[in-house]
């Protein structure tokens, strides 16, 4: 089969790709344009997806960002506009506001914005049965074209699977004028693909999880394009902004192709999710997602060098597991996360995640495949200096305090990263091998 890894983003939509991995890769996306002046194409794109009466979901900031012409064109449709302050959050309350305002005569939910508005639109589409689309206003995150929404449900950061949008439009003239923090956020989210791709392959080796080399190559190609454009992003160079935005959109397409966020999300995203949960539980406002992910990626890339130097043994795995106590683990989660711990504990019990037989089987497989696992980790560690230099040049955060996080928060999130959900992370591997505690000490030294 001819690979799709090097196709232009617009060439990835409207097709089905039978693959050697056994899946036929496809996306619901039918209309995609990332270009200068793309807003002029919105009426034609709506027609392409058979949308005659979209319901527009935006906020006061994004309504202003798209400019007078687009604003006037969209005002003829039913809409709901969140205030600029307090900013909308991806939670039940803000979703309920959109549901209450929704016009059931509409045939498309059209978000005008970036992360939170896109997630709320997907959820509104999920509950209403309508397809969704998005007019992107910032190159800030990788969820535009994905088949999931990142929500805070009952205080727990959760990925809810939704149909992918049918329309994605990004006008480079709008995108390049996004706030600087959002430009940095998009870069952080894209550079995180290095660790996400590594951990996807590691999980496949350690657990037999499904993995697709072609989807991974597609994501790698988007990452490489972003790396080559990073210098121009904060200069608001149109070509650089377009390349990074296309990379973020391709990330979502890759998630849809694989029916999982694996190609784009690993331990670094889980750390970000936990930091968000801690901030919200204390009544705070989390830092932009991509800035958190960028900081977590910095730490993980540096830690990879130490992980690659490990020489794990069956005895070490057995010894560490023998010291594990389920009751103590549950009590610790409840102490840290309060009521938010209950769904985390319930999920682990359903999966038998901490039970002796699954742990022993995972450890045995990981040990048998350790040479291959180490090669994957070494390959990503070899790119650490280059990627961290790009982060530094772009002014991405270097320390937790820059994101209103304490070192204690950063340590806590790393310790509990394997507990948030069922995804097999690098920290899951370290726990199975009995190496999590020593790596926690190395991680703490990076902060």
State where each predicted segment sits.
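A glycine/threonine-rich phosphate-anchoring loop and its flanking beta-alpha core
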Residues: 128-225
